Amino acid sequence: MIQLPPHHLPAEPRWFAPGAPGPAALPEHVTATGVGSWWADRALDPRAVAVSCAGHVLLSGDPGSVAPGLLAPFAHSHVEAPVRFLPVLGSAFDRVVPDERMVYIHREPVEPPRPPRGVTVRRLTPTDAPALAALSADSSWIYDSWGGPEGLAASEHGWAAVDRDGRVAAVACGYFTGQAYEDVAVLTTPERRRERLALACVTALCADITARAHGELVLRTREPPEPPAGLDGGLPA
């Protein structure tokens, strides 16, 4: 598929239903943040479109208009698409691996765990960008959907457990943010695991999301993406 320039984007509601949970919030997130890309089978009057961000892809439209070779940019990605796209996905890649995720429906308040001495759980601010950038390379995925550590730090959609020296021990954030739902990512550094820091960050983030959404909260916790050689996709992605 061809990547569309910012001034020639398709009308989002026509292709993707707004207000859906999980990665379905991706189009709203890309539109609002400018992080990610829109794709189409052709620039004028597209018959199929895709939106991608941080290794995740949503497909919509007529799969018959998509030659397998047009999907090459989405190799090694997590793909969510209607079932009708499975034949062309199977033709485009050596391996298509279905991926299922647990969806948590948050309805009851949860008492936040008390962090250990010397650790503060708080909202990220722009001054936290260097601490996020200092995370290991294996942890860099946590800010990919915001375009980098500076984007996540300034987003007002992230909470972190920070020690006295300003190091980030755990972080939870809205990975894909929509008007009705946010897809949540959470990360704890290896040396600070089993201290309930991730739970403390997620609890604070969920309270923040609920205060903004004023309604039911549906969350997906996500692990670092590890797609196989080929395409990692299926329903759901």
From Swiss-Prot:
Transmembrane is among the record's keywords: no
Q: Taking every annotated instance into account, which residue ranges of this chain make up the domain N-acetyltransferase?
A: 119-237
Q: Does the keyword NADP apply?
A: no
Family annotation (InterPro entries): Acyl_CoA_acyltransferase (IPR016181), GNAT_dom (IPR000182)
Keywords, A to Z? Acyltransferase, Transferase
Q: What's a Gene Ontology MF term here? A: acyltransferase activity, transferring groups other than amino-acyl groups
**PROSITE patterns in alphabetical order:** GNAT
EC main class here is: transferase
Which E.C. number(s) belong to this protein? Answer: 2.3.1.-
> What protein is this chain from?
Uncharacterized N-acetyltransferase in mutA 5'region
* Organism, scientific name: Streptomyces virginiae
